[in-house]
Swiss-Prot record:
CDD domains: KAS_I_II. GO terms for biological process: fatty acid biosynthetic process. Catalyzes the condensation reaction of fatty acid synthesis by the addition to an acyl acceptor of two carbons from malonyl-ACP. SUPFAM superfamilies: Thiolase-like (SSF53901). Residues 1-45 are annotated as: Disordered. The keyword Membrane does not apply. This is 3-oxoacyl-[acyl-carrier-protein] synthase I, chloroplastic.
C-alpha cells in the first residue's frame, strides 16, 4: 500500500526515506492555552456583531432548508448506489448522490446546460439564501442595498470537476479544437462566487477559498472578518462541491479513503464506530447570508442566529494524516472560542467533522477533550453519517444543521452507531434525535493539508 493511502486510512507505515530536518523542541502556541486573566467578552458593537439572516442549500435531501433538517432529525440516510455513471468496476459503488436536482427559476436554461454542477449548486443555494433573508431578486430590500458593500464568498475544494474531466477527454480523443471555450471559466474555483455576484449585482468582496474539506468554514471566517473590519455590510458565504463523477470517485478510491461497504451502503458511514472503514462521498452546497447586526436591524431583517467567531490554522504535520497529539485542532478550537468571547463551559453542542475514517475520528475526539474537560455536558453528532462527506461543501451544510439545532431545540442523530470506540464518551446522539437547548454550538471542519477550521454559533440575543 502506498504510504499516503495508508495514512488516509489511519494505518501505521514506516517513516519516509527522504531526509528530515533535525527536530527542534516544539513550543506550544499561545493560542493553545485559554486566557485566564479575565472572563471572555462577546462583541457588543452592532457594526461588528455578525448575524445570520438567510440560509440556502442543495443537498441529497433536496433544496429546502426545513426539509433537509427534518430528514436529518428523522435519521434518514441519503446514501445509495451511484447511478449517474457506470460504477460497477469501482471497489466503491455508492455515495450521497443528488438526484432530480432542478434549478428552474434560478438559472436560465441556456446557462444551466453549460454549467458544472458545482456552479449550479452554488447559484441556487446563494439565491435561495438571499430569498430567505428577504433579499430576493427585485425585492424592495434588494433594490435598496448598497451593492458595493455586499459580497459573495463561496468556495469549493475541487472546482468544476465535470467540466475539467470532459475537457481533458475531448483533448485526448478529438484534439484541442474540440475543447469548449467554457472549459477554463467553468473549471476554476472562483467562478461560482463570480457568477452568483454577477446574477445578483453584488460588487463587494468576491473570491473563493479552497482548503479541501475545511473550505466552507474558511469562507465563513473570512466573510465575518470583512464585516467586522467595516469592509462589507453583507456577504453570501459557504461552500459547494460536485465530485461524484468517475475521476472524483477514482481519485478517492486510489487514496483508499472510501468505505467499501457496497452490500449495505446506508450503514457505510459510521463515525466513531469500531467497524468504520472509510468515508462516503457526498455533494451539494451550503450557504449563509452573513450580515452586520447594524445593517440587519436597519432593514428589519429576519435574524436566525448569531455567528460569534471562528478560527483557522494548520497542523503543519502531514498531507492527509491528522496530528496524533491533536495540537492543531485543539488550538483551533481554543482560538475560535477566544474570538467568539466564549468560555469552554458555555459550549454544549458540537457538530463534529467525524468522517468515519480510522485516524480522523479519534484524533478529533482527543483534541476536543483537551479543550472541554466535562464531555458529559456536550452533545456531539455527525451530519455526514446521513449525507456523506460533501468535501468543500461539508462545512456549509453542517453550519446549517448547527443553526437549525439552535432554532428548533432538537439535535439530529448520528446514525449507524453500533459499536462505539471506548474513547468516545460524549453523547453522540446515537441513532435517535434528542431535544436539546443549544447555548453555544461549534462546527468543526478539517481538510487535507492539515487545514483546521472551527466556527461558533449561538442563539441571537439583542
Amino acid at each position: 500500500m502506498h504510504a499516503h493511502a495508508a495514512h488516509a486510512l489511519g494505518l501505521r507505515v514506516p517513516p519516509p526515506a527522504f531526509p528530515r530536518r533535525r527536530a527542534r523542541p516544539r513550543r506550544r502556541p499561545a493560542a493553545a492555552v485559554l486566557a485566564t486573566s479575565a472572563a471572555p467578552q462577546r462583541e457588543t458593537d452592532p457594526r461588528k456583531r455578525v448575524v445570520i439572516t438567510g440560509m440556502g442549500l442543495a443537498s441529497v435531501f433536496g433544496s429546502d432548508v426545513d426539509t433537509f433538517y427534518d430528514r436529518l432529525l428523522a435519521g434518514e440516510s441519503g446514501v445509495g448506489p451511484i447511478d449517474r455513471f457506470d460504477a460497477s468496476s469501482f471497489p466503491t459503488r455508492f455515495a450521497g448522490q443528488i438526484r432530480g436536482f432542478s434549478s428552474e427559476g434560478y438559472i436560465d436554461g441556456k446557462n444551466d446546460r453549460r454549467l458544472d454542477d458545482c456552479i449550479r449548486y452554488c447559484i441556487l443555494s446563494g439565491k435561495k439564501a438571499l430569498e430567505s433573508a428577504g433579499l430576493g431578486a427585485g425585492s424592495d430590500a434588494h433594490v435598496k442595498l448598497d451593492v458595493g458593500r455586499a459580497g459573495v464568498l463561496v468556495g469549493t475544494g475541487m472546482g468544476g470537476l465535470s467540466v475539467f474531466s470532459d475537457g481533458v477527454q475531448n483533448l485526448i480523443e478529438k484534439g484541442y479544437r474540440k475543447i469548449s471555450p467554457f472549459f477554463i471559466p467553468y473549471a476554476i474555483t472562483n467562478m461560482g462566487s463570480a457568477l452568483l455576484a454577477i446574477d445578483v449585482g453584488f460588487m463587494g468582496p468576491n473570491y473563493s477559498i479552497s482548503t479541501a474539506c475545511a473550505t466552507s468554514n474558511y469562507c465563513f471566517y473570512a466573510a465575518a472578518n470583512h464585516i467586522r473590519r467595516g469592509e462589507a455590510d453583507i456577504i453570501v458565504a459557504g461552500g459547494t462541491e460536485a465530485a461524484i463523477i468517475p475521476i472524483g470517485l477514482g481519485g478517492f478510491v486510489a487514496c483508499r479513503a472510501l468505505s467499501q461497504r457496497n452490500d449495505d451502503p446506508i450503514t457505510a458511514c459510521r463515525p466513531w464506530d469500531k467497524e468504520r472503514d472509510g468515508f462516503v462521498m457526498g455533494e451539494g452546497a451550503g450557504v449563509l447570508v452573513m450580515e452586520s447586526l447594524e445593517h440587519a436591524m436597519k432593514r428589519d431583517a429576519p435574524i436566525i442566529a448569531e455567528y460569534l467567531g471562528g478560527a483557522v490554522n494548520c497542523d503543519a504535520y502531514h498531507m492527509t494524516d491528522p496530528r496524533a497529539d491533536g495540537l492543531g485542532v485543539s488550538s483551533c478550537i481554543t482560538m475560535s472560542l477566544r474570538d467568539a468571547g466564549v468560555a469552554p463551559e458555555e459550549v454544549n453542542y458540537i457538530n463534529a467533522h467525524a468522517t468515519s475514517t480510522l485516524a480522523g475520528d479519534l484524533a478529533e475526539v482527543r483534541a476536543i477533550k483537551q479543550v472541554f474537560k466535562n464531555p458529559s455536558e456536550i452533545k456531539i453528532n455527525s451530519t455526514k453519517s446521513m449525507i456523506g462527506h460533501c468535501l468543500g461543501a461539508a462545512g456549509g451544510l453542517e453550519a446549517i444543521a448547527t443553526i437549525k439545532s439552535i432554532t428548533t431545540g432538537w439535535v439530529h442523530p448520528t446514525i449507524n452507531q453500533f459499536n462505539p470506540e471506548p474513547e468516545v464518551d460524549f453523547d453522540t446522539v446515537a441513532n435517535e434525535k434528542k431535544q436539546h437547548e443549544v447555548n453555544v454550538g461549534i462546527s468543526n471542519s478539517f481538510g487535507f493539508g492539515g487545514h483546521n477550521s472551527v466556527v461558533v454559533f449561538a442563539p441571537f440575543k439583542p
